[in-house]
UniProtKB/Swiss-Prot annotation:
SUPFAM superfamilies, A to Z: Restriction endonuclease-like
Superkingdom of this protein's organism: Bacteria
GO molecular function terms noted in the UniProt entry: nucleic acid binding
Protein name stated in the entry: UPF0102 protein RPB_0420
Family annotation (NCBIfam families): PRK12497.1-3, PRK12497.1-5, YraN family protein
Length: 128
């Protein structure tokens, strides 16, 4: 017997749309700062990277957080999420070996309504 697919709950749809909107704002903000967007929503079995951006010889793996207040967004990248992002970054580098010699960094962009996004370079690092 085939499973019936149920539509997603309205709050999940709203959260998804908020995330897409925040990622679009973050990407535009990074481009205005001179970054080139190499990938968005890069998915792997071990995690997802919201944005992969390049500026000169730097690759930034960017986590985007949307919250009602920027202060709340700043605390939204948990250690577990950091590990998943690091694992996804390793997968991205294996799929894009021409960037393996670049400087690597893990950034965050915080997005709140009616505010400019806030870019946090080196929001966390890959050291254990």
């Amino acid at each position: 017997m085939a499973k019936t697919k149920h539509p997603p709950a309205p709050d999940r749809v709203a959260a998804f749309q908020t995330g897409i909107s925040a990622e679009t704002r973050a990407a535009a903000y990074l481009m205005a700062k001179g970054y080139r967007i190499l990938a968005r929503r890069f998915k792997t079995p071990c995690g997802e990277i919201d944005i992969v951006a390049q500026r000169r010889q730097l690759i930034a793996f960017v986590e985007v957080k949307a919250r009602a207040r920027l202060d709340d967004a700043a605390y939204a990248v948990t250690p577990r999420q950091q590990q998943r992002i690091i694992a996804a970054a390793e997968a991205w580098l294996m799929a894009n070996p021409d960037h393996a010699t670049f400087e690597l960094r893990f950034d965050a962009v915080l997005v709140a309504p009616k505010r400019l996004p806030q870019h946090l370079p080196a929001a966390f690092d890959a050291s254990p």
